[in-house]
Amino acid sequence: MPNAPEVNSVWDELLWRGLVCVSTDQGALKELLDGPPIRFYCGFDPTAPSLHVGNLAQILIMRRLQLAGHRPIALVGGSTGLIGDPRPGGERQLHSHEQVQEWVRALQQQLSRFLDFKGAAAAVLVNNLDWTKSLTALDFLRELGKHFRVNAMLKKDAVAARLSSTEGISYTEFSYQILQSLDFRQLYLDYKCVLQIGGSDQWGNITSGVDLIRKTEGAGVHAFGSPLLTASDGSKFGKTEGNAIWLDADLTSPWSFYQFFLNSDDADIPRLLRVFTFFTRSEIEDLNRSVRENASARLAHRHLAYSVTRLVHGADVADQVLLACSVLFGDGGALGKTQTGLPRIDSDTLNDSSGVTTIKAQDNTYTPYSPEGVRFAGTFPVDPRFLRSILFELPNATVSAHDLITHILQKVGLCRSLSEARRLISQGGIYVNNIKVTCPDALLDSFLDNSMPIRAAILRKGKKHLAAVFY
């Protein structure tokens, strides 16, 4: 079956990638986006010190539009962040002015990494506090409030959900949609911005801005919303064990970030490739085919995880994550192909000296995408400090070097019982420092290199379950 043709229209590209679920007139939007460059915007409220992967989906829509020649405005809500967008779960906690403005600066710095601020399609960063800090209560009521009808405001999904709850909604959060509408109008006046994008959960606020511009300026502007990302099991995408997956490496390490995408459910892969990568349509279809025909190889998962990690944390860090996977998992699987000569985890691997462990790849090319896998050429250094930092992120325990491997497996949670540990060892599914454990009565010290600068060992169950022990 031949690959489908690539998409030439940016609007059709957005539709194919599943990035539009609600919009103003689609015919007008297609004409707008497939025509001369326009200004468009997306807003991000500073509710935390970092953006997360849900925000990344919106940022990448901005980048796709910028690559098509359109000029993005990234708005960080220094004023709306002080108020809080109503959410079904209840009233948001109000943060101090100082805290919110600190988060504004952090989010602006993050956004600056993903957009191009030079050239004909140069992006602009704005803070809505700049035009709301001098707005008086009387001006708010006279110049803005009179254009909003309470009946219409009550019908917005977020407001309606809160009104049906026992807690209700405060006037503070009820007014949020007016402030967001003001943002769109201000950007229309200052930059001739004619398009707002955002998540579908913001659609009520977005259309309020469209209506405000029509009423006050007599102009027609446009908007579209993208679907909220959920995992195949219905859970909110971007959460793991209740914690958000942040773009800040200090909040979610590059290793954990990579593992989050690597461990995506097979059913989620086609959509995640469309949303989070810049792979072409034919490349994505090749990867989807690999999931159907050889799911155990997890080729598409590896491409997804590597590509997004590289995008967020840079090529050098993404390469270190990939090489660390090759060392820790022992068989080169992180590269999508089995390699020979991968090192035993020993004193050199975790040494803190100027020397580094190296992996000699067997392939002669490297590209971020290839049908066979993410590939490296030549000899690549593995930063031992990076490897050491990963040990403390893994499930871990302090043990004695004279403990039985079976007892350790149970202690670190790789096995639920001693009988399970013995069974897995007899089946050849347990490794210590990349050495297969063959005897159920083996002790930890028979696998150790005591010259290591950190007294640690890495246990692996099967292909992907790791734990660290310190002795």
UniProtKB/Swiss-Prot annotation:
Keywords: Aminoacyl-tRNA synthetase, ATP-binding, Cytoplasm, Ligase, Nucleotide-binding, Protein biosynthesis, RNA-binding. ATP binds at K239. A motif ('KMSKS' region) lies at residues 236-240. Its EC number is 6.1.1.1. GO terms for cellular component: cytosol. One of its GO terms (molecular function) is ATP binding. It holds the Pfam family tRNA-synt_1b. Residues 403-471 form the S4 RNA-binding domain. InterPro entries: aa-tRNA-synth_I_CS, aa-tRNA-synth_Ic, Rossmann-like_a/b/a_fold, S4_RNA-bd_sf, SYY-like_C, Tyr-tRNA-ligase, Tyr-tRNA-ligase_bac-type, Tyr-tRNA-ligase_bac_1. Transmembrane segments: none annotated. CDD domains: S4 (cd00165), TyrRS_core (cd00805). A motif ('HIGH' region) lies at residues 46-55. GO terms for biological process: tyrosyl-tRNA aminoacylation. Its main location: cytoplasm. L-tyrosine binds at Y41, Y176, Q180. It is found in: Cytoplasm. It catalyses: tRNA(Tyr) + L-tyrosine + ATP = L-tyrosyl-tRNA(Tyr) + AMP + diphosphate + H(+). Homodimer. Belongs to the class-I aminoacyl-tRNA synthetase family. TyrS type 1 subfamily. HAMAP family: Tyr_tRNA_synth_type1. Catalyzes the attachment of tyrosine to tRNA(Tyr) in a two-step reaction: tyrosine is first activated by ATP to form Tyr-AMP and then transferred to the acceptor end of tRNA(Tyr). This is Tyrosine--tRNA ligase.
